[in-house]
């Protein structure tokens, strides 16, 4: 079982811990609980440790064209310093994983897949990569922290960080003396940011964030609230709304497919499904009342 570099912090807070994708991670914290943590993010701000998320790099001449042949979305549609939600499919249209691709340049990309699928994502890309492309698993090299909620900018601004970046854009900033990748992304449906410090700097950055949310009545939040927040927003989770048996078209995630690209892994099957061959399609339901 893997543990977060912040594991001792969670244990000290008496967090309820559980296996999440092969990682022992905090689900909720005493004195608050999932509902209170959920409300804090919707109304104020919350911070999350999501260091279980995967990290990988794809580098080399032609990395842009290579990834565009593998991933569903069109990376030519974003510029350097931007990120994109995308999927890696099998030749039969199933989803190996959904992930965020950070574009540093045409020959340099950073990927953030899901925890339990990182090894599979790296293996698929390595098996497809030409000699000049290097795909590296960096899962243990970085932590991932999230600051989510309408007051998220105030948290970072109190630490001297410029928060005026576009949605899905990223920058390199300094927090607690550490170099951090700051991206205007999240998994809650609220205004927010995700931060990637090196593992060795995770505790210092976390402590700075934890101190900064106190004047705003923010909360430290677990993965239980993250799941209810993403469900309320309608975001898919691999293994549930997306899987090797559920395609992007069937999961109503066709918006993350670059339909005008020449081809990519699974493109023939997905194109046929889009044209009407899909036998099923997930739909969201909104509860109007309790019950």
Regions found by a protein language model. Name each.
Residues 42-43, 71, 88-90, 205-206, ...:
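Short, intrinsically disordered/low-complexity patches at protein termini
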Residues 79-95, 163-176:
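Conserved alpha/beta core surface patches that mediate binding of polyanionic ligands
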Residues 1-86, 94-96:
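Acidic, proline/glycine-enriched N-terminal capping motif
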Residues 69, 77-79, 88-94, 99-105, ...:
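Short, charge-rich binding segments
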Residues 1-29, 37, 102-291:
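Conserved, structured C-terminal
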């Amino acid at each position: 079982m893997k543990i977060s570099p912040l594991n001792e912090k969670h244990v000290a807070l008496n967090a309820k811990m559980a296996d999440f994708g092969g990682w022992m991670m905090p689900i909720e914290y005493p004195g608050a609980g999932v509902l209170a943590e959920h409300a804090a993010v919707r109304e104020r701000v919350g911070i999350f440790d999501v260091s279980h998320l995967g990290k990988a790099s794809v580098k080399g001449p032609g990395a842009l064209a290579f990834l565009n042949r593998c991933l569903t979305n069109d990376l030519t549609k974003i510029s350097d310093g931007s990120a994109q939600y995308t999927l890696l499919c099998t030749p039969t249209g199933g989803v190996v994983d959904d992930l965020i691709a950070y574009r540093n340049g045409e020959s340099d990309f950073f990927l953030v897949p899901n925890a339990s699928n990182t090894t599979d994502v790296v293996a698929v890309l390595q098996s497809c990569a030409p000699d000049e492309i290097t795909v590296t698993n960096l899962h243990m090299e970085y932590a991932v922290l999230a600051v989510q909620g309408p007051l998220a900018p105030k948290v970072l601004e109190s630490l001297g960080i410029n928060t005026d970046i576009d949605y899905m854009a990223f920058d390199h900033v300094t927090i607690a003396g550490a170099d951090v990748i700051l991206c205007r992304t999240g998994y809650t449906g609220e205004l927010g940011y995700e931060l990637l410090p090196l593992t060795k700097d995770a505790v210092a950055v976390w402590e700075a964030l934890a101190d900064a949310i106190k004047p705003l009545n923010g909360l430290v939040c677990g993965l239980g609230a993250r799941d209810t927040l993403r469900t309320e927003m309608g975001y898919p989770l691999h293994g549930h709304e997306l899987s090797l048996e559920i395609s992007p078209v069937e999961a109503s995630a066709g918006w993350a497919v670059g339909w005008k690209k020449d081809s990519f892994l699974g493109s023939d099957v997905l194109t046929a499904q889009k044209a009407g061959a899909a036998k099923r399609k997930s739909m969201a339901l909104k509860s109007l009342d309790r019950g």
